[in-house]
């Protein structure tokens, strides 16, 4: 199996998922949890929210730095577009290189958004990060019972 195949395997079969920007206010994280329960996912979620010790009944970390070391397979990003590059750098510094970017405000908004998207893509490429997104709904792996889907 090639290095890329191994990385994709870990990306699509993640069992320890950080959700940066998880909040009970907007309902997105609640959707993620509901979809994971529906598919019977064997997934542990680690919501990251600087203002909460718990999000939707799941114990939260107040920062990316507070995530358990060497455990996280994958990170989903639910923050505003202007925070994304900083979040990516923090994740990379923790060795988290598999990323799903839910955030919008990129190519779908026009030329300025395409430039912002290019900056995110360039950063991820340069840092060896696998990126799905931006502005996507996520994925479900029915075979492995993994759900990282907002819909």
Q: Where are the language model's segments positioned?
A:
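Catalytic-core regions of core metabolic enzymes
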Residues: 1-151
């Amino acid at each position: 199996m090639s290095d890329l195949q191994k990385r994709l395997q870990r990306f699509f079969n993640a069992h320890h998922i950080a959700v940066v920007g998880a909040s009970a206010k907007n309902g997105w994280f609640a959707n993620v949890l509901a979809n994971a329960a529906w598919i019977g996912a064997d997934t542990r979620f680690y919501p990251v929210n600087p203002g909460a010790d718990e999000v939707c009944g799941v114990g939260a970390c107040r920062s990316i730095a507070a995530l358990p070391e060497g455990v996280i397979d994958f990170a989903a990003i639910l923050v505003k577009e202007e925070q994304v590059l900083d979040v990516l750098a923090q994740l990379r510094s923790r060795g988290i290189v598999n990323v799903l970017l839910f955030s919008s405000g990129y190519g779908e908004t026009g030329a300025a958004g395409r430039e912002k998207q290019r900056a995110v893509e360039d950063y991820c490429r340069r840092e060896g990060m696998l990126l799905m997104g931006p502005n996507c709904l996520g994925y479900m792996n029915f075979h492995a019972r993994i759900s990282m889907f907002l819909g």
